[in-house]
């Protein structure tokens, strides 16, 4: 699997090689995940500086939007069926191993009408929790 390159104009160092490697390893271990995106806030910076630092669908360096910030600030996950109807997108708070909130992880899972959405959320939470165990702190990514 190839690492996504930062887009033209992205901030220098926007893509974290460590985060990208962790993301790619996670996708290999979880083929049920169609996409995975990690939004992380650099240590000591305001949450409005939260940005995508690892992804298998591009957008590296993209700043958090209002939805991302809402999840980050409230700690409540959000879900949506994709416009094409074949993917269930789950966005969850992303924690480090000390359970400190460091950002948001978005996980896309295959979906068809009638699928158990609660089970898909549990799958996404399991993937997120496996990531958490491998992240000592957000500083590891910067």
For the regions a language model picked out, list residue spans one by one.
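Short N-terminal helix-loop-first-beta-strand/juxtamembrane motif that initiates sensory/input modules
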Residues: 24-46, 141
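Amphipathic coiled-coil signal-relay and dimerization helices
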Residues: 44-58
């Amino acid at each position: 699997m190839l690492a996504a390159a930062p887009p033209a104009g992205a901030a220098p160092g926007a893509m974290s090689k460590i985060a990208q490697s962790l993301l790619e390893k996670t996708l290999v271990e979880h083929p049920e995940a169609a996409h995975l995106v990690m939004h992380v806030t650099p240590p000591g910076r305001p949450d409005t500086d939260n940005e995508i630092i690892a992804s298998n669908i591009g957008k590296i360096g993209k700043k958090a939007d209002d939805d991302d910030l809402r999840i980050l600030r409230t700690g409540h996950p959000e879900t949506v069926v994709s416009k094409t109807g074949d993917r269930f997108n789950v966005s969850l708070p992303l924690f480090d191993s000390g359970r400190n909130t460091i950002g948001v992880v978005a996980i896309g899972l295959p979906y068809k009408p009638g699928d158990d959405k609660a089970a898909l959320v549990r799958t996404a939470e399991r993937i997120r929790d496996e990531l958490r165990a491998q992240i000592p702190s957000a500083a590891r990514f910067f």
